[in-house]
Amino acid sequence: MSEILTDDQVANLIALLRADVSIDTKVQQVTVVKSSIKQHMVPESCIVPVFEALHLASSSQHALLVNAGFTALNHLFTRLVRQDPRSLTKEGTRALPLIVEKLGDQKEKFRQLASQALATLYKVAPVEVERSVRNIAMVGKNARAKEASLHWLLQMHQEQGLQFRAYVPTMMELLEDADGMVRDVAKSTVIELFRNAPGPAKSDLKKQLKNFKVRPAIEQAIVKELNPTSSAPASQPDPESVEPSYVNTTRELDEIFREMHGYFEGKETEQNWLKREESVTKLRRLIAGNAATDFHDQFLTGLRALLDGIIKAVVSLRTSLSKEGCSLIQEIAKAYGPAMDPMVEILMQTFIKLTAATKKIASAQANTTVDTIISKVTYNNRIMQHVWLACQDKNVQPRLYASGWLRTLLAKEAHHKNHVEHTGGLDLIEKCIKKGLSDANPGVREKMRATYWMFAGVWPAKAEAIMNGLDSTAARLLQNDPNNPKSPKKPEGGARPGLGLSKSTMGTSKPSVREAMMAQKRAMTTKTVPTRPGSAMSHFSPAKSVSSLSQPPPAAPTVRARPESAMLGSTGGISGAPMRPGRRKVETARPATAGPYSVRSHDQPSAEQTSPPSRPKPKAVTPKSITSSPKRTAPKMARSATVSGEPQLPTPTRAGSPKVMGSPRATPSRSVPPTVAPPSSSPSKRHEDFSLVVPIMTSSASPPREEQRFVKPVEDEDMDMSPSDTPSKPGQHSPDAPASPPQTVAAVDEEPISITTPLRSVEVAVPSPPSASRSLEVYEDPLTREQLTTPKLIFGPVLEDRSVNEDAAILQQAVRQQQEQQQQQQQQNGAANGMALSPEKLKQNQRLLDSGISKVQQRSLDVHGFRKLQGIIRDSDTKPTTGTALLTDDKFDALVAGLFDFLESPLTNLAPEKTQDVKAQVLATIKLLLKRTRASFQPHVSRGLESLLRARAVYEGRTHIVSGLELLAADLAGLGDASEIVLVLCRMLSDLDVDSAAHAAAGGVGGGAGRSLSMGLHVLREMLDARGAAFVPSDAELAALAALAGGCLESLESAVRMDAVLLCVALHARVGDARFWEALKGVKEDPKSLITYYIVKRQREVGAAGVGQAA
């Protein structure tokens, strides 16, 4: 333990620092002094020499000595603040130049220590510290010192209440600094300093930004960030939104209106119309900002004073100006509602007159504006009178729009019928409807019918009286209107009003003659297709010879293939229903018979391998040649050859070229991995020219089973395979190759092929991607020829139906085992042969890892940063040359804790579409850490499960991240201690309100408590099932689980109730019948019956499974 400092010890330290001795000795002595300062009071006589000694150490050129001296100086400041502030004021100000210099140091640690020292010294000497920061650090040439001083200024304002007004001119200059990082820090500092500042301060900031000519991008970013977070509520989104503009004082608002008045005086001219449009747009921006909320009355007063000018803009012949004026009135109505009642009279007159304009845009905008005004302002009889006048207008457009205004009025006042009736509005509504139903224009009549049925829902007796007053034709049309709840007609079948009963407006009633003939031809072609025989010999002609196969195929029938869109869209009526293009008839499986029929079955595509065509085809199609048919997936040649004893007939692809049977090892594409998937479409001609190394048996006396050899096609190096013409993925041609006997290989040519190399038996293996530069060489050792094991052939019934992919499952399992073995071998080779990290790479990774952990804790790491962090985590498995681990325990704990905090945080600063991508990367990083360091994850299991449940509350079940959350929760539940998990999850889930969860699912504001609750119950059930008999809950754990399940059984949400029932079933399997029902004795009878049903169901399933395994 260190001792109290003495004068001799400090004097010796000063002498040692000035002497020419080793750095380690100096660092050791400074460290001793630092320990004494941290643990003991500094004697008054030693304060000045200690300051001198530490100043010497901090001014050294050696980093180790500077680190020791500057940290000791910081501890000395902290000690003297409590021990002797007067001495710190005197001696600390002398150290200010050194501290300000360290603000610009290259190492971030020294910059942080300098900022901390300034914060400590500010408590005793604020004036001197501010002067040094403002006049030295902020105006110097060191960019790091400027950044650090800005951070310090913000920190002092938030913690000590530092007044920053004197710093504003300096910060304006830093906003235009040559260094980009300084500009960014200055912008963020200004935003944070003025975020909660009063309105006059923000107005002064805007003036300062203008005076210092700050670049517009920075200025707009600052002003936008300082805007209020909420704007005036709007029931409907504006068709063309504007950038919000904000004012901070009433005086500023008055200056804006005073400037606008001059633009709206007199008539519209070429000189003032653009200023008028800009003024109207400015008013819209103010409404979008804070004028209507923060300065409600003042802004409305200004608008009323400017109303004449706004109306001049509305009735302008310039479309853009008129459109802006209409949009302004709509936004005023939405923002103020009944507060604009005094302006309604003149506005209704103006806009109803404008609806009769010949310009479609102006008329439509006026209609929308009137509708918005009616829906927002207080109802009075004058509004209804304006609508009645519009119904009598000589122009058709106001009469057409009036029906929509009536519907808006009825929807708004349906719950206040008395007010409408007592003011005479009901009579006017009746007059409007009668006038519209008898209007000369059919469009007006049709629109008014919809209004009538809405009126009938509010005043049915009045509507019945109107109906009785109509003539028979008008009454029938009204009854058949689609808006009639009891209408026998639907809107799709009727003619459009005013257009007559033409063919273009009515659905076709019967198909045309041409379509009928086409349907008849399609029916005839389907009759010519023979049915699949139930036995051999039926409907099949003898096998074709080689010469017949080389002939070109016969011409297709003269039937024009129509595109699918024409078939679907050109017919109408009942008999001419849309027809899907004809598809090849699915044929039943060929029975495994004796004779050449099994050989001939290879000429036809199998039912399972033939995929749907890539484009629509009619049923009358060109007959396909045998050469273009895909090969049967499962080899059947071996059995048929052995059983029948007949020679095998080859199937050449074209005349003059030898053709062999499909090898069990297919030629894969270089870019496609060998996976087992459904077969694709038929191969194209370009894949029929593969060259094969074919062993030909020279002796015909050999047994058939010794003729069976596997061959491998050589991959064409110059072939470019595209997805459209690739026959199938590797490994699909013979999925049962490892489990079935090899296939007989034969070739037909005019001259026999001589084999100079002796043949060798080929071992059957799981298909793997071969190299494109190598081909399979087939040899046979004559010495081991007699020792070959004869494959045992399995005989079945002669007419047995054989599945094409009967051994696909065996192949899938073999492929999976081989891939796992390859991965293990690669990992072992990588561990054995991997190069160790160099010291430079290790330092870089350590720096990046520390930065990544810091950004994760601050929740500011983006998607690319997470991917880089994942790469560093993968590199952490590589052993460095220095022996120092990259991911230490402290860093691992900090990273895992930060990741889980990141996962459950809402990330409100990101856009919703980016939040889920970032969360997915957080999840991937956690999974990678769990995979790499599974043993170290044990202390974080409970915390991780809580974070996963909280994160689950945000996402719907269809979101892709939900499956990742559930899988990670299952892994953590299997890793952690079961007792701890039960207690932690039960305590967390019990705090969730079941009713709130159901309310949220029904559209309430309770959040996603129901989702978290459901997932938590699911995790507990899965853990109980996975642990099995190894985990039996104790009495306390059983009581907690039973209490949780009992509360969830009463939930209003079905998913929570179901998960609670399944948890009870799993709990019953662990604790037995007596303990289980004793724990659930407080549950109601209905849930108990449901639990009993599922318990019995599970017992039957377990019993049936046990019997099946025994059998």
From Swiss-Prot:
Regions of compositional bias (Basic and acidic residues) in chain numbering: 704-714
Protease among keywords:
no
GO MF annotations, alphabetized: microtubule binding
Give the main location: cytoplasm
UniProt entry keywords in alphabetical sequence: Cell cycle, Cell division, Cytoplasm, Cytoskeleton, Microtubule, Mitosis, Nucleus, Repeat
The ranges of the HEAT repeats are 95-133, 167-205
Query: InterPro entries, from UniProt?
Result: ARM-like (IPR011989), ARM-type_fold (IPR016024), CLASP_N_dom (IPR024395), TOG (IPR034085)
Region Disordered: start and end of each range? 225-245, 476-751
Q: Where is the composition biased (Polar residues)?
A: 502-511
The reply on keyword Cell division is: yes
Q: Which Pfam families match?
A: CLASP_N (PF12348)
**Subcellular localization, per the record?**
Cytoplasm, Cytoskeleton; Nucleus; Cytoplasm, Cytoskeleton, Spindle
Its transmembrane ranges are none
Gene Ontology BP, a term: mitotic spindle assembly
| Cellular component GO terms held in the UniProt record | cytoplasmic microtubule; microtubule organizing center; mitotic spindle midzone; nucleus; spindle microtubule
* Assembly: Interacts with microtubules.
Q: Which family does it belong to?
A: Belongs to the CLASP family.
Task: Quote the function comment for this protein.
Answer: Microtubule binding protein that promotes the stabilization of dynamic microtubules. Required for mitotic spindle formation.
Question: Which protein are we looking at?
Answer: Protein STU1
The gene is STU1
